[in-house]
Amino acid sequence: MELFLTGKILKPRGLKGEVKVELITDFPHHFVKRKQFFVGVSPSSVVCMQVTKAALHGGFAWLFFEGIDTFEQATTLVGFSLFITEEELAPQPENHVYRHEIVGMRVVDGNGKLFGTVTDIFNMPAHDVYEVQVEGKTVLLPAIEAFVESFELASKTIVMSRCWEFL
């Protein structure tokens, strides 16, 4: 079963086991409607946990899990990630892709010369930023129209003619 990252537990809140979750989704309202998540450090070490209460506030999700009833129990979840199955992924609007489809894509310049490989995506307030591994170095590239010439999902290639400016 393939699992997909959708949130990260940041900290506990209050005495009754509530946790603050960083959302890694374009669909926060779908996130808080979920009744369960696979929770763990990585997709290979998860347990299925039932959500008893969920809310959105201040750009974060606030969750209560079944069996997590104290501050101390909630503290044990800090740093864990929340995953969902492929069947639970919300359909993407046209011209949108999932994060997991971008990670691993090749970045090439306008001449087709390989620049590097996308290893992560950061959701920043103004726009997303691609983390790209280039010959052992990490380079951050803005994911904006001015730099991204084309995005070819079938060939897993992002064309950015100005990528060399960021070295």
From Swiss-Prot:
Keywords: Chaperone, Cytoplasm, Ribosome biogenesis, rRNA processing. InterPro entries: PRC_barrel-like_sf, PRC_RimM, RimM, RimM_N, RimM_N_sf, Transl_B-barrel_sf. It is found in: Cytoplasm. GO terms for molecular function: ribosome binding. Gene3D superfamilies: PRC-barrel domain, RimM. SUPFAM superfamilies: PRC-barrel domain, Translation proteins. GO terms for cellular component: cytoplasm; ribosome. Binds ribosomal protein uS19. Belongs to the RimM family. An accessory protein needed during the final step in the assembly of 30S ribosomal subunit, possibly for assembly of the head region. Essential for efficient processing of 16S rRNA. May be needed both before and after RbfA during the maturation of 16S rRNA. It has affinity for free ribosomal 30S subunits but not for 70S ribosomes. PANTHER family: RIBOSOME MATURATION FACTOR RIMM. The PRC barrel domain binds ribosomal protein uS19. This is Ribosome maturation factor RimM. It comes from Chlorobium chlorochromatii (strain CaD3). The gene is rimM.
